[in-house]
């Protein structure tokens, strides 16, 4: 079982195209249902943010899964796959795992080191768990990626400035408008990014804050935390006329602020209105750029500014940590790979002991039950002690050199049947789900991953080229 990642991101994809490819929550859920409901994908999750749309799938075969994902992106997205094919990145097996590690750590973000993406990865995985699509393999990979991200954040200064996209955007606005302290601000949206925006605006010293959202309850809860006011989105035209700075981040698939509404709002203004649109797709119609006294900053504006936000030393340190964590992940995966053979060995030993005890019972019927039970206990204890050290050691060695050679050695030495079923728990088909039932151990129990399939079918260069370019994480 190998991990396959197919997606588009801010790296190499025009934002005008990326904003059309972004999936809303309903689209992502439906795509996930069809993905894991297919016979070619066992586990999966969908990560859709303002920076990327990526499908993560645990698969046996590369080519059928790649074809399926391409079809699903066209079926559930807002863009035909042919339009984005030249921008698609494809990662497989170890490269796919390394890519997820980099994404979770913020090293593949538009703002290097930003930590909102950790929550986005966690949310994507949680949805997969809730729908029964996160089994042992995906669980191990995601938990190791989140652990690696925590190490990067704790051991480097890659996000020491605490900057977010909003912080950088407000800096650009202040360069064009002048200091933002003392100005009135309007935040459109009430989700996680809106909360980040409100905090950033508070730090720069705005004096009047209004949060507008379709869900007034959420807007009120957010505004009250910062002594602001809440308003319904229906009052947007009036709110725009009364504010100096707007930060919009709704996640709507259609523009929230159109040129006609803003034309009325800025009529007669003498001071410019600053707009920071960090939504993808755009919340604010780009046509507003032609209006007088309107200064708009969006993700396209931010992209070149964000390229050099983290120091090269911090990035190198972070990548070194990710390399260490990836090596540890591979070692754990390899150690688990020898477990079926170890279980088969212990199972054979138990069957041999049981047969010999039955033979002894027939040959010495004069033994009373107490004596026979003492013999049984002693024999089991001897066998357990003989097997304990080598089976523990073989798992340690497999973690260093891979499971295949040690598994083969055990099977040869003890004449184990490689096809013999062993008692290892695994995700089972769910009667109420088209995919595998969820496997939900604790978040830190990331060592139950199945063995890495070194003989899994590798992606051909032609297939990767057909789907897009294969990029390094």
From Swiss-Prot:
SUPFAM superfamilies: Glutamyl tRNA-reductase catalytic, N-terminal domain, Glutamyl tRNA-reductase dimerization domain, NAD(P)-binding Rossmann-fold domains
MF terms in GO: glutamyl-tRNA reductase activity; NADP binding
Pathway membership, UniProt: Porphyrin-containing compound metabolism; protoporphyrin-IX biosynthesis; 5-aminolevulinate from L-glutamyl-tRNA(Glu): step 1/2
Site (Important for activity): 99
InterPro entries: 4pyrrol_synth_GluRdtase, 4pyrrol_synth_GluRdtase_dimer, 4pyrrol_synth_GluRdtase_N, GluRdtase_CS, GluRdtase_dimer_dom_sf, GluRdtase_N_sf, NAD(P)-bd_dom_sf, Shikm_DH/Glu-tRNA_Rdtase
EC number of the protein: 1.2.1.70
Active site: 50 (nucleophile)
Catalytic activity line of the entry: (S)-4-amino-5-oxopentanoate + tRNA(Glu) + NADP(+) = L-glutamyl-tRNA(Glu) + NADPH + H(+)
Record's subunit section: Homodimer.
Additional information: During catalysis, the active site Cys acts as a nucleophile attacking the alpha-carbonyl group of tRNA-bound glutamate with the formation of a thioester intermediate between enzyme and glutamate, and the concomitant release of tRNA(Glu). The thioester intermediate is finally reduced by direct hydride transfer from NADPH, to form the product GSA.
UniProt name for this protein: Glutamyl-tRNA reductase
Organism: Acidothermus cellulolyticus (strain ATCC 43068 / DSM 8971 / 11B)
């Amino acid at each position: 079982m190998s991990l396959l990642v197919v997606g588009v991101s801010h790296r190499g994809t025009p934002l005008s195209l990326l904003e059309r490819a972004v999936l809303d929550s309903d689209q992502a859920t439906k795509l996930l249902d069809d993905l894991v409901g297919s016979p070619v994908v066992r586990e999966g999750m969908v990560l859709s943010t303002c920076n990327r749309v990526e499908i993560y799938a645990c698969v046996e075969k590369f080519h059928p899964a790649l074809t399926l994902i391409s079809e699903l992106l066209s079926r559930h997205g807002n863009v035909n796959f042919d339009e984005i094919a030249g921008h698609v990145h494809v990662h497989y097996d170890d490269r796919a795992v390394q890519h997820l590690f980099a994404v979770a750590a913020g090293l593949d973000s538009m703002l290097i080191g930003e930590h909102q993406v950790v929550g986005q990865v966690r949310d994507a995985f949680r949805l997969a768990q809730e729908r029964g699509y996160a089994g042992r393999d995906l669980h191990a990979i995601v938990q190791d990626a989140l652990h690696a991200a925590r190490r990067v954040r704790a051991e480097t200064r890659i996000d020491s400035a605490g900057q977010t996209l909003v912080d950088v955007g407000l800096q650009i606005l202040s360069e064009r408008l002048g200091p933002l302290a003392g100005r009135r601000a309007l935040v459109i949206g009430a989700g996680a990014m809106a909360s980040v925006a409100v905090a950033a605006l508070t730090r720069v010293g705005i004096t009047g804050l209004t949060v507008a959202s379709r869900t007034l309850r959420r807007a009120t809860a957010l505004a009250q935390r910062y002594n602001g006011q809440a308003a319904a989105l229906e009052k947007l035209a009036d709110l725009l006329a009364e504010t100096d700075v707007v930060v919009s981040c709704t996640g709507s698939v259609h523009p929230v602020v159109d040129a006609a509404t803003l034309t009325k709002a800025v009529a007669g203004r003498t001071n410019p209105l600053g707009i920071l649109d960090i939504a993808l797709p755009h919340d604010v119609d780009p046509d507003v750029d032609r209006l007088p006294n309107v200064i708009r900053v969006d993700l396209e504006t931010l992209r070149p500014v964000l390229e050099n936000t983290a120091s090269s030393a911090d990035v190198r340190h972070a990548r070194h940590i990710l390399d260490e964590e990836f090596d540890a992940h591979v070692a754990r995966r390899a150690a688990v790979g020898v477990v079926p053979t170890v279980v088969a060995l212990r199972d054979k030993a138990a069957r041999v002991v049981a047969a010999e005890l039955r033979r002894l019972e027939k040959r010495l019927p004069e033994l009373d039950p107490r004596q026979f039970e003492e013999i049984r206990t002693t024999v089991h204890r001897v066998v357990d002690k003989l097997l304990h050290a080598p089976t523990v050691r073989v798992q340690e060695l497999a973690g260093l050199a891979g499971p295949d050679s040690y598994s083969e050695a055990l099977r040869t030495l003890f004449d184990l049947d490689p096809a013999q079923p062993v008692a290892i728990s695994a995700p089972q088909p769910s009667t109420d789900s088209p995919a595998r039932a969820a496997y939900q151990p604790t978040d830190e129990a990331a060592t139950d991953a199945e063995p890495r399939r070194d003989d899994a079918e590798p992606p051909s260069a032609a297939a990767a080229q057909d789907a897009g370019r294969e990029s390094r994480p």
